[in-house]
Amino acid sequence: MGKVNVAKLRYMSRDDFRVLTAVEMGMKNHEIVPCSLIASIASLKHGGCNKILRELVKHKLIAWERTKTVQGYRLTNAGYDYLALKTLSSRQVVESVGNQMGVGKESDIYIVANEAGQQLALKLHRLGRTSFRNLKNKRDYHKHRHNVSWLYLSRLSAMKEFAYMKALYERKFPVPKPIDYNRHAVIMELINGYPLCQIHHVEDPASVYDEAMELIVKLGNHGLIHGDFNEFNLMLDKDDHITMIDFPQMVSTSHPNAEWYFDRDVKCIREFFMKRFSYESELYPTFSDIRKEDSLDVEVSASGYTKEMQADDELLHPVGPDDKITETEEDSDFTFSDEEMLEKAKVWRSELEKEADPADESGGSWCCSSTDSKQIKDGGLPEESAHVSSFEVTALSQAVEEMERQVLPHRSVTEFSEESRRTENDGQPGQRSPAGSEDCDDEPPHLIALSSVNREFRPFRDEESMSSVTRHRTRTLSVTSAGSALSCSTIPPELVKQKVKRQLTRQQKAAARRRLQKGEANVFTKQRRENMQNIKSSLEAASFWGD
């Protein structure tokens, strides 16, 4: 894990990066990627995958490993750096790479420049350089995976840091401006300052101390705790202002150990100022001083904020007083209307039984009295009475529907079919059954009334609607099928030729790919040759001793 040597980057071809990317893709589910898989993923046009692999091994971009069961290649940190730099250069973010500025336990910092000559900072994450025995317990990069690669963890760390940096920069926190990221590389603004650990004299230690403590509290108010807030992750410019760096290990204030992390950050700053600048203050923040203003931990998914906590937060939001009033009003209106409907239906049914004529009862139809109809026609009925009458008619129809639901389940299918046939016979003129017939006595009067009403509302269709053609049928009619009787095919012959040619080309490419994969997978041939050589040498030794 030395310095990045980008001198060979300009001489690498497209096929070299294709094979390097194939090794990276194979490492998603392989610790050691076999040669056959690399050849099939790369799918080089002219072959030669083994030759490129040997060149990449020579330049230490990949490494050859062989165990008792498998043998193949794995990606190194240098190869991962080349892939990230190639992508950033294609995006026109990085044009040149300069000197190394700093080395940390988890990252390397380099000076880079874009096409305009503006200097930026390149941070390459190097998780796994030092021993992290409890990494799975301290960081949540791996989620629920048991076996993870250090390259993959470095990529997750860079992605998380870029997300934090972007969110904090948009909220006016003193952090570098994020530019771009790819894989384990993060491009950010180059800060003109020095780390706080390298500074031995400050004009006003109290102001710097207050600014650091205010920054800790401000992070807590936004739902975040730095987790590693010390002199190594703070930079001081010429005006003695603090800039915060290196925060992929941030945790949420909802974390079970949030108070411990908060107190540790405060303790680190207090001890540093007391040792370096001989400054000690009795004023320092505590975890209870946090007043949450924003949920930045939810936005960037900080450690400790789970989906269960998010669901609990949604349940904890109380319903406003307006919502409660609306719900109670809706429930009360619905209950009152239902009771009133039933009462009105009972009253109206009793009145109909008293005032209805025998002929109307036998015929199964009901109507209003002559005086009421006359008043309605003349318009002499007041508005309130008209409204009440319309409401009562609606209530009666609803009551009739309720009675239908009670009667129909107890009737058999044959009875229902016989009733439908009798209803059809009743609908024909001159064939109406007498009032005292058995059919009418067996059937409830309201069912006969509904059947007569339904016959009055049958759909009406004129001649134009009967002769119209469905629209989607007209769209499928082609000119050749409608106007030509000589040809039965509706597909142009040119299109048929193109499809056949495309299919043949696809088959040829598939066959070439299979031959390429078979030719590249020469590891087994090498093993057979070694075994034959061992057998031959053992036989020669046996014949030499005369056995």
Swiss-Prot record:
Keywords of the record, alphabetical order, are: ATP-binding, Cytoplasm, Kinase, Magnesium, Metal-binding, Nucleotide-binding, Phosphoprotein, Ribosome biogenesis, Serine/threonine-protein kinase, Transferase
Major site of localization recorded for this protein: cytoplasm
Q: Where does ATP bind?
A: 123
Q: Domain Protein kinase, which positions? A: 97-273
Q: State any GO BP term from the record.
A: protein autophosphorylation
A Pfam family: Rio2_N
User: What protein name is recorded for this chain?
Assistant: Serine/threonine-protein kinase RIO2
